[in-house]
Regions:
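Charged, low-complexity intrinsically disordered segments and flexible loops
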Residues: 30-33, 93-94, 131-133
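Short helix-coil junctions and helix-kink-helix linkers
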Residues: 77-79, 84-104
Length: 133
């Protein structure tokens, strides 16, 4: 498995398997970040999202829909995407750090948790779900 550094990032695929992207940690950022490179687009999420999302999934105790959506689109209730921007999550709002690119939490975080052995993700063409391991 990759080290998750800029030099040795995690190489991941979206849950449907249609797109590839990389992620790595930037612990020197303020706040510490996960850097997600999708083609020429860079997205950033709070590093603590890994532990926080895993804890929330464990609380749910079952499969949770991913519900990936862009920042400007509403997220369906009860989805990973909705939790990643909810005022009721541990950071009180968005885990995404780059304005205009804060969405897609439900697309890019689940495969990382699966890679790290923290979650199981379905890999269907649409309507994917995840659960904690």
């Amino acid at each position: 498995m990759a080290a998750g550094t800029k030099e040795d990032p995690w190489e991941l695929k979206t849950p449907p398997g249609t797109s590839s992207y990389t992620m790595y940690t930037d612990e020197q950022a303020d706040p510490p970040a996960l850097v997600c490179q999708v083609g020429s687009t860079t997205l950033k999420y709070r590093l603590r999202a890994i532990k926080d999302l895993h804890a929330w999934l464990k609380e749910q105790g079952d499969w949770v829909p991913l519900g990936a959506a862009d920042e400007k689109k509403p997220a369906a209730d009860g989805t990973v995407e909705a939790w990643g921007r909810s005022a009721n999550n541990p950071v009180g709002g968005w885990y995404g750090l780059r304005s205009g690119y804060r969405g897609r939490f439900g697309m890019y975080l689940p495969p990382l948790l699966e890679e790290l052995g923290l979650a199981e993700v379905s890999h269907d063409a649409r309507n994917n779900r995840m659960r904690a391991i």
